UniProtKB/Swiss-Prot annotation:
Source species of the chain: Methanococcus maripaludis (strain C6 / ATCC BAA-1332)
GO biological process, one term: translation
Entry keyword set: Ribonucleoprotein, Ribosomal protein
Protein name from the UniProt record: Large ribosomal subunit protein eL34
Family: Belongs to the eukaryotic ribosomal protein eL34 family.
Organism taxonomic ancestry: Archaea, Methanobacteriati, Methanobacteriota, Methanomada group, Methanococci
Keyword Ribonucleoprotein among UniProt keywords: yes
GO molecular function: structural constituent of ribosome
Gene designation per UniProt: rpl34e
GO CC terms in record: ribonucleoprotein complex; ribosome
Cited InterPro entries: Ribosomal_eL34 (IPR008195), Ribosomal_eL34_C_sf (IPR038562), Ribosomal_L34e_arc-type (IPR047868)
């Protein structure tokens, strides 16, 4: 019987062949989904993909791009927003 921690949806089953032609199940953590832009939903470049535990071990500069709204908006949406704010200013 599997342990309770493996019964949740966050554990991914991987079937392996063991010696003697027996099949065993390994459990792995699923990967986090890619970060997306808050405005248009496009995938964000420069933002790591991983669980929170793995990301907290990274340096601050490796967690998101060093530009305005880095890690939240894609460059196209940032440019559109800045142009719109400059025109309304």
């Amino acid at each position: 019987m599997s342990a309770p921690r493996y019964k949740s949806g966050s554990a991914k089953k991987v079937y392996k062949k063991a010696p003697g032609n027996s099949s065993i199940v390994h459990y792995r953590r699923k990967k986090q989904s890619n970060a997306v832009c808050g405005a248009c939903g496009a995938l964000l470049n420069g933002v790591p993909r991983g669980r929170a535990v793995e990301i907290t071990k990274l340096a601050k500069t490796q967690k998101r791009p060093e530009r305005a709204f880095g890690g939240n908006l894609c460059p196209k949406c940032v440019k559109k927003m800045m142009v719109a704010k400059a025109r309304n200013f």
